[in-house]
Swiss-Prot record:
Protein name in UniProt: Transcriptional regulator Myc-B
Motif (9aaTAD): 79-87
Subcellular location: Nucleus
GO CC list: nucleus
Biased composition (Basic and acidic residues): 233-244
Description of how the protein assembles with itself and partners: Efficient DNA binding requires dimerization with another bHLH protein. Binds DNA as a heterodimer with max.
One GO molecular-function entry: protein dimerization activity
Region (Disordered) residue spans: 183-251, 298-318
Function as written in the Swiss-Prot or TrEMBL entry: Transcription factor that binds DNA in a non-specific manner, yet also specifically recognizes the core sequence 5'-CAC[GA]TG-3'. Activates the transcription of growth-related genes.
Domain notes: The 9aaTAD motif is a transactivation domain present in a large number of yeast and animal transcription factors.
């Protein structure tokens, strides 16, 4: 977009507290922009004529001192510098270099409604020119005087003395808490708040005491950030902490390790189940006795322990029992495999194959049982018939 170098210099200020733009078009024939001769239309000139913006929400009053003060405060200078968009070099050139500021403000983008939001250029030009002139005069006078620091502090106090009733609650505009900006401004800790960390009981090595100390530290930090400290809650907190400290001193924690025998099974060893079959019941009985002894020993040792050590012991005992159960199940499958003729010589037979062959073997054995029972019945009847005939022959 070509820029018009012969355009009139307009020094716009970006402080919206001094002027609030409202877009209402009472007169439709009135042009929105004051066109210069030979100046192309702005990018959003045709767009904004199709809309009608609602008024902006109420803004908080300016907390800077009045423009009639002879020397601007530190907050005033920081606010003025933050008004200009750009880095430090651009800000310095806008404030101090008149030629650069004129060339910068001649841009039509700065005058565009989408960028600056100005609807009354004449009023804004007047307000901004008066403010810049007063600020430049104040800076010249402040550079000649020797009491600039005192005046700055006075201006800062005047800035902070604005009544709070004229301000808008920041939580309405900014729903999220600004914790980073409020941390440097927290008040000095009172004697009650400084003595709070000293009353915390020493760390006893348990997770409950460490969590209590962390929560107490967080509560202490929150109390230091607050301007008013509730004396009642502080006294209650002290009494609770003292009672906790006495309880910990009266019942000291005794940490003792109980060794648990873990029998690791060698899964790579060759399964020699035929020789171990007579001793399977004895191994099961001894393993159950050993597990019961370990559980009772763990219960005796776990009475003075903390919750973490109890959980570890329970987990370790569960792992031992689970490992023994798996070993017993494996030995049972090996014993069943040796009984079945189809898979007796197959040491790598899967458990599913062993179960299928066992089912088939049981069905065939049941059939043989029924056949043998019927044959036995036939033989019994034949025997009785022969006995009766023998008696008849003997009587005759």
């Amino acid at each position: 977009m070509p820029l018009n170098s012969s355009m009139e210099c307009k020094n716009y200020d970006y402080d919206y507290d001094s002027y609030q733009p409202y877009f209402y078009f009472d007169n439709e024939d009135e042009d929105f922009y004051n066109h210069q001769h030979g100046q192309p239309p702005a990018p959003s000139e045709d767009i904004w004529k199709k809309f009608e913006l609602l008024p902006t929400p109420p803004l908080s009053p300016s907390r800077r001192p009045s423009l009639s003060d002879p020397f601007p405060s530190t907050a005033d200078k920081l606010e003025m510098v933050s008004e200009f968009l750009g880095d430090d070099v651009v800000n310095h050139s806008i404030i101090c270099d008149a030629d650069y500021s004129q060339s910068f403000l001649k841009s039509i983008i700065i005058q565009d409604c989408m960028w600056s939001g100005f609807s009354a250029a004449a009023k804004l030009e007047k307000v901004v020119s008066e403010r810049l002139a007063s600020l430049q005069a104040a800076r010249k006078e402040s550079s000649r005087t020797e009491s600039a620091d005192i005046c700055r502090s006075v201006g800062f106090l005047q800035d902070m003395s604005t009544p709070a009733s004229q301000c808008i609650d920041p939580s309405v505009v900014f729903p999220f808490p600004l914790t980073d900006s409020t941390k440097p401004c927290k008040p000095a800790p009172t004697p009650a708040s400084t003595t709070l960390p000293l009353d915390t009981p020493p760390n006893s090595g348990s997770s409950s005491s460490s969590s209590d100390s962390e929560s107490d530290d967080e509560d202490d930090e929150d109390e230091e950030e607050e301007e008013e400290i509730d004396v009642v809650t502080v006294e209650k907190r002290k009494s609770v902490k003292k009672s906790d400290a006495n309880a910990t001193h009266q019942s000291p924690v005794v940490l003792k390790r109980c060794h648990v025998n873990i029998h690791q099974h060698n899964y790579a060893a060759h399964p020699s189940t035929r020789n171990e079959q007579p001793a399977v019941k004895r191994i099961k009985f001894e393993s159950h006795i050993r597990v019961f002894k370990q559980i009772s020993h763990n219960r005796k040792c776990a009475s003075p322990r903390t919750s973490d050590s109890e959980d570890n012991d329970k987990r370790r005992t569960h792992n031992v029992l689970e490992r023994q159960r798996r070993n017993e199940l494996k030995l049972s499958f090996f014993a069943l495999r040796d009984v079945i003729p189809d898979v007796a010589n197959n040491e790598k037979a899967a458990k599913v194959v062993i179960l299928k062959k066992a089912t088939e073997c049981i069905a065939s054995m049941q059939e043989d049982e029924q056949r043998l029972i019927s044959l036995k019945e036939q033989l019994r009847r034949k025997c009785e018939h022969l006995k009766q005939r023998l008696e008849q022959l003997s009587c005759s």
